[in-house]
Regions:
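Bacterial N-terminal signal peptides that target proteins for export
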Residues: 1-9
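Hydrophobic helical h-region of N-terminal Sec-dependent signal peptides
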Residues: 10-15
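C-terminal motif of bacterial Sec signal peptides marking the signal peptidase cleavage site
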Residues: 17-20
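Acidic, Ser/Thr/Pro
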Residues: 22-166
Length: 166
């Protein structure tokens, strides 16, 4: 009988040890997709970009940033240029160029390399601007408003008001 008792105890111990050694299958690795992240959306808001009167000799650049997750940012604004002061007459003598550039285009512009612009107005002294910018995806995007004086001999005064609606 002692042998049966030892055998029963050994069998019981093996069952306890065997039950304790069972492993659960490993959990699958979590894959995080960037679109799973929730971030505040700028939809329904506006951002003032530029409201200024300045003297334009050769060119002037104004940077602004579109926040992440802006699906259809819309640039709206006005500019008027004058050959003398901001309250003078605005005619062909006050014509300037206006460009909207992304960072790559701006780097080309600054480096005097040929490049395209997202939006261009040439030879204008009074212009309304309504332009839909590309969506910003998951990162903020920087843009530049560039005012250029094709007549480098005579300075011009430029009045601007620009905003972005999301």
């Amino acid at each position: 009988m002692p042998q049966h008792r030892h055998l029963a105890m050994l069998l019981g111990a093996l069952l306890v040890v065997g039950a304790g050694c069972t492993q659960e299958p490993p959990k699958p690795a979590s894959t995080i997709v960037p679109s799973d992240h929730v971030a505040p959306s700028p939809v329904g808001t506006s951002q003032n970009v530029l409201e200024k009167t300045f003297t334009l000799k050769k060119s002037a650049e104004f940077a602004f940033e579109i926040p992440a997750h802006a699906v259809q940012p819309q640039l709206h604004g006005l500019f008027a240029s004058f050959p003398g002061d901001a309250h003078g007459t605005s005619d062909a003598n006050a014509d300037i160029d206006f460009l909207v550039l992304n960072e790559e285009q701006h780097a080309d512009f600054v480096g005097n390399r040929p490049s395209e612009a997202l939006f261009t107005v040439e030879d204008s002294n009074n212009q309304a601007v309504n332009f839909i910018l590309p969506a910003s995806q998951s990162q903020p995007v920087k843009y530049y408003l560039v005012f250029r004086n094709p007549d480098n001999k005579h300075s011009k005064v430029v009045k601007t008001t620009f905003r972005v609606d999301f």
